[in-house]
Curated annotation (Swiss-Prot):
Its main location: nucleus. Sumoylated. The N-terminal RRM domains are responsible for recognizing the G-tract of BCL-X RNA. It comes from the Eukaryota. The record marks 16, 20, 52, 75, 116, 120, 150, 173, 294, 298, 326, 349 as: Interaction with RNA. Residues 81-86, 179-184, 355-360 are annotated as: Interaction with RNA. There is a cross-link at residues 87, 167, 185, 200, 224 (Glycyl lysine isopeptide (Lys-Gly) (interchain with G-Cter in SUMO2)). The modification Phosphothreonine is found at residue 215. The keyword Iron does not apply. The gene is HNRNPF. The keyword Nucleus applies. The modification N6-acetyllysine is found at residues 200, 224. This is Heterogeneous nuclear ribonucleoprotein F. Identified in the spliceosome C complex. Interacts with AGO1, AGO2, TBP and TXNL4/DIM1. It comes from Macaca fascicularis (Crab-eating macaque).
């Protein structure tokens, strides 16, 4: 005699041949003559490593009679599919569920789902509305782009718990606009796999409530023409705007020029030079308190870096990308205060995954935040109205990439 669900092998059946879009409600309707233990929570779909339904599921029932009733449903149809029903037990169910799907034994149940079929231009706010009532963690929405900076139509969403992620799967085949959205189980590991070159995660619209500060930035290639530094959108320039932008940049010899080749080094007190081995680039910090990282794993994400410095909370993370579109293994991390930047240095030579990380401090007490003043901008030939400017985030010479976030006709900052 089988023991009850609280103390033994339970009353479990296995279904095979389920439609790919099968929902918990579909299973409940199929077994409407049976009592399912714990209701919807008693239905357990089996997933592939890619997070897709495998067409099989375990169902916990209330009694031995319910098992017998379920077995009578063998070869009955659900939609156009014939469903096979087998007797099973809790040990088999637990083992299979533990070793299948992206959240298997070697992956944490971290609350991720993957969306597919998003409409062009879909925003993070629309995704939040799509999952209305389900808590998404801060910075929990990732929109991958292809090597040309175009949205792939997919997204990863991390919920506050695995239970919420399971509920999110119930939104499968619901609509955003006129598009049907597919929702699959996912994992941190799958998200990281998308960060392999040449694919990168980059924000492609104004920052929303689920973005960390500083994540809305664009990557801009730099090309020198006719005595001025001309910034044109590169493959990763996917922020809005779409117009060519011009900005004064370091010429690589320690001199900084404006649009017309004039020396501006006297006014850029917030800028500092990095020379770490063969790496040479110029970055403007928004706080003046920066730690440079070297030796990052190529799969490292911004979240990995935030976690690396935990419990400290960086203000901004900038992962360097080289001219070939690949990560360089280096990054700049800004902190709110000099004291926090110094505290972060305690992580020097600590490991991230299998790599030990070198840290370099670039912060002094009372460092400037690097904002341009109205007087300086007017000295560049910019009108007083246009001189309300602050926030040129990063300019890279050797890496041929900068990280600014701007609107149309701007010079690297907000309109």
């Amino acid at each position: 005699m089988m023991l009850g669900p609280e103390g033994g092998e339970g009353f479990v059946v296995k279904l095979r041949g389920l439609p790919w879009s099968c929902s918990v409600e579909d299973v409940q309707n199929f077994l409407s003559d049976c009592t399912i233990h714990d209701g919807a929570a008693g239905v357990h779909f089996i997933y592939t490593r890619e997070g897709r339904q495998s067409g099989e599921a375990f169902v916990e029932l209330g009694s031995e009679d319910d098992v017998k009733m379920a077995l009578k449903k063998d070869r009955e149809s659900m939609g156009h599919r014939y469903i096979e029903v087998f007797k099973s037990h809790r040990t088999e169910m637990d083992w299979v569920l533990k070793h299948s799907g992206p959240n298997s034994a070697d992956s944490a149940n971290d609350g991720f789902v993957r969306l597919r079929g998003l409409p062009f231009g879909c925003t993070k706010e629309e995704i939040v509305q799509f999952f209305s009532g389900l808590e998404i963690v801060p910075n929990g929405i990732t929109l991958p782009v292809d090597p040309e900076g175009k949205i792939t139509g997919e997204a990863f969403v991390q919920f506050a718990s695995q239970e919420l992620a399971e509920k999110a799967l119930g939104k499968h085949k619901e609509r955003i606009g006129h598009r049907y959205i597919e929702v699959f189980k996912s994992s941190q590991e799958e998200v990281r796999s998308y960060s392999d070159p040449p694919l990168k995660f980059m924000s492609v619209q104004r920052p929303g409530p689920y973005d960390r500060p500083g994540t809305a930035r664009r990557y801009i290639g730099i090309v020198k023409q006719a005595g001025l530094e001309r910034m044109r959108p590169s493959a990763y320039s996917t922020g809005y705007g779409g117009y060519e932008e011009y900005s004064g940049l370091s010429d690589g010899y320690g001199f900084t020029t404006d649009l017309f080749g004039r020396d501006l080094s006297y006014c850029l007190s917030g800028m500092y030079d990095h020379r770490y081995g063969d790496s040479e680039f110029t970055v403007q910090s928004t706080t003046g308190h920066c730690v440079h990282m070297r030796g990052l794993p190529y799969k490292a994400t911004e979240n990995d870096i935030y976690n690396f410095f935990s419990p400290l909370n960086p203000v901004r993370v900038h992962i360097e990308i080289g001219p070939d579109g690949r990560v360089t293994g280096e990054a700049d991390v800004e902190f709110a205060t000099h004291e926090e930047a110094v505290a972060a240095m305690s992580k020097d030579r600590a490991n991230m995954q299998h790599r030990y990380i070198e840290l370099f401090l670039n912060s002094t007490t009372g460092a400037s935040n690097g904002a341009y003043s109205s007087q300086v901008m007017q000295g560049m030939g910019v009108s007083s109205a246009q001189a309300t400017y602050s926030g040129l985030e990063s300019q890279s010479v050797s890496g041929c990439y900068g990280a600014g976030y701007s609107g149309q006709n701007s010079m690297g900052g907000y309109d």
